[in-house]
Amino acid sequence: MSFIVVIPARYHSTRLPAKPLLDILGQTMIERVTNQALKSGAKQVIVATDDQRIVDALKHLNEIDVCMTSKDHQSGTDRLAEVCQQFKLADDEIIVNVQGDEPLIPPSVIIQVATNLQQNSAASVATLSAPIEDVADVFNTNAVKVVCDKNNMALYFSRATIPWNRDDFSVENQAEKSVDFTALQRHIGIYAYRASFLRQYATLSVSPLELLEKLEQLRVLWHGFKIHVEQANKIPPPGIDTQDDLQRVIDCLSH
């Protein structure tokens, strides 16, 4: 199938300055992400950035395109919408948003989310999830949960523990870490969109829920659009947010 990968890459990061240009065994992090995207068979890979230093760091890569975008975007999705405009992408083009801090993302996951959207015409967006397997993630606000309807359309995404098991999630069980979390799904932050929807997304007002939870996908649900969620065929390793994360990736690639 045909799809395009867009990788938003902001230079400034609160916890890791110049994060896209961090060295990982002789390659920048953003270059490693583009390599994984190319392995997916995408017909085009575009890095969307707001900083000339990232443009310069990628000049030697002939297989990808780099798009300079505005520094004023509120989210990575808004940045994707600008890419659609600059490249004049056809309305039915499928765009996969790959995070710029995931140098180990499996190419199969990129293919899966693109296929997911292609096969679900009622959805404006497709994304992935995975069963929560660690009790530490049940009440971890950084592990975003998703609840779906019977057709695997998202009902809600939250940093809170949803669905809440009224009978099992007692204070005692929480303290003993003996809660039953088999019904919980963790959201995996990869998305597929049609270019037509990205253009529409850029015109949508920011939703109160999005501001409250700091989850941009809630803008989609707030405005009445559907997000299809499928369980990932392979669980992507966590992205890089801290120096410890960076070392973990380096250790993984060294073995």
From Swiss-Prot:
GO biological process: CMP-keto-3-deoxy-D-manno-octulosonic acid biosynthetic process; lipopolysaccharide biosynthetic process
Annotated signal peptide: none
Entry EC number(s): 2.7.7.38
GO cellular component assignments: cytosol
InterPro entries according to UniProt: Cytidylyl_trans, KdsB, Nucleotide-diphossugar_trans
Subcellular location: Cytoplasm
MF terms in GO: 3-deoxy-manno-octulosonate cytidylyltransferase activity
Keyword Secreted recorded: no
Known pathway: Nucleotide-sugar biosynthesis; CMP-3-deoxy-D-manno-octulosonate biosynthesis; CMP-3-deoxy-D-manno-octulosonate from 3-deoxy-D-manno-octulosonate and CTP: step 1/1; Bacterial outer membrane biogenesis; lipopolysaccharide biosynthesis
Keywords: Cytoplasm, Lipopolysaccharide biosynthesis, Nucleotidyltransferase, Transferase
Pfam families in UniProt: CTP_transf_3
Statement: the UniProt record of this protein carries the keyword Transferase: yes
Recorded family membership: Belongs to the KdsB family.
Job of this protein: Activates KDO (a required 8-carbon sugar) for incorporation into bacterial lipopolysaccharide in Gram-negative bacteria.
Protein name as annotated: 3-deoxy-manno-octulosonate cytidylyltransferase
Organism for this UniProt entry: Psychromonas ingrahamii (strain DSM 17664 / CCUG 51855 / 37)
Gene: kdsB
